């Protein structure tokens, strides 16, 4: 009962955001007339899947080979382009022109550590174009072409679209596409761009674990349940914790690793056999793309078999130099090779639990998604963490994400009818979003794990007298200083009426839409002038390693961050006091006509010395700034008090004015 009250209370706290979600939801329904049939696509690293909501239920659609999941592979031969099974099946004989794992490149920068690592592991060529990873490949007639990751992803999306069209007997233009929950803005934008290239209107981007939760919870009626979705796929890993209550799916927390999955486990098997071959045969096959292609295929097959068997034999005919390869691989060896990677999955689980504020015994169901969750060791680690609780195996781990996306498609198109009319999806932003204020401080507007869609406004002011332009620098990250966060984009708001510092009011509004994509607007309240920016994938977004580093460092260096922020605040307090004092003694409406000449001279001298000291002591400690403020106050405050007493007004120094929080705004 207490849990129910706690959840109700939190839903009240989210009332405004919830209203926003409901509003967005109602808009989606209004737009339903404009949308045709909306398919749901799980665009996976290794496999993709498509579904549609039809006749009151979801149909997962089989491809032209009769398979319900399609390899996310593309290949070029002298005669044609191949997608899916056809591409994967010829990989061993055409390795340099067969492209896979492109989801690991999408929305990333060429210099990302993960991209550089993948560059060494894949047989095709990854090149740098405008700071982004592109794939260089020979297409027909020896012509070389470079493709962006979005273009390759679009080819896979096109295949899924055509699969749905063949089944439905009509053209499809609208889709819901899923992404890992921990995908950042650049990766989401790039995925939407891939949809556009494929001729699709991506009506909604939704998070994979949330889609899986819909698949699990669609027919679950009755009371409130806390569920943990553990989504370990071919290339990405997500953990999301949700509350399901009569059709309302509210995400409480999400965490993950956008570069961890089954492909990494395959790679460990390959590395093991490469060493074994070198030892037994004195042959290094690590640069032989044909041999590696054959080995990769068998490593994946062996991994799958070891989920149900304790030993397999890896056999490859004519692996190199006419030598046939045949070696056993036990489940114990496989687990030993990947032990650190398996254990790595527990970190995001713990973090998500902390962020959700839940105890282990408050999780009602653990839902497994993604083919890699079939690995017994992964299931065992999860079971051990939750004190023996058995994971729920009621959803198909390969199809659950596409299933949930298809349900969302049914809601958007209106084809869901009564079965889906009560479903409301409340997802979250995975990273804190904010802007830079004076001293390089990260002023946070939208904290991580805030329910989306959401909108937050805050009023800021100018830092200098007569300032007519402010630069709005937008960051994401968990640290308190922007130098430790990631710049997403910046823009200038110009034409602000000249005024003393602290006078203009500039309202900055952050809006995150239902796809998790950010729009920022700045408006000068006096003139009504405004500028805005949509953060897009050309702004150089975070890599997963950077996200993890930021969160980890935020925890490790929280105390250090606090000290640096206190130092900046102390400097700003001193600076604000000095400027306020100078403004007052020169303003006829304030103190200019009430001061004796020697009093004015004392204040001018004290404030001038303080400003010179500030210029010479840019990196002073908090205590130094506090001490200097006391020195200036010791000169100025008695004079101000005397002036007020002479004029019969209430005493009160500029210090009190400068320290009032009610009307103060951070300076840009």
UniProtKB/Swiss-Prot annotation:
Glycosylation site residues:
617
Q: Where is this region: Disordered?
A: 645-668
Please provide, in alphabetical order, the Gene Ontology terms of the cellular component aspect for this entry: cytoplasm; endoplasmic reticulum chaperone complex; endoplasmic reticulum lumen; membrane; nucleus
Acidic residues: compositionally biased ranges = 657-668
List the source organism. Answer: Nicotiana tabacum
Which SUPFAM superfamilies does UniProt cross-reference here? Actin-like ATPase domain, Heat shock protein 70kD (HSP70), C-terminal subdomain, Heat shock protein 70kD (HSP70), peptide-binding domain
Localization per record: Endoplasmic reticulum lumen
A GO molecular function term, named singly, is:
ATP-dependent protein folding chaperone
Report keywords, A-Z: ATP-binding, Endoplasmic reticulum, Glycoprotein, Nucleotide-binding, Signal
This molecule's function is given as: Probably plays a role in facilitating the assembly of multimeric protein complexes inside the ER.
Q: What's one Pfam family here? A: HSP70
UniProt short sequence motif Prevents secretion from ER, positions renumbered to this chain: 665-668
Name listed for the protein in its UniProt record: Luminal-binding protein 5
**Where is the secretion signal located?**
1-24
Q: Which domain of life is it from?
A: Eukaryota
- Can you tell me which family this protein belongs to? Belongs to the heat shock protein 70 family.
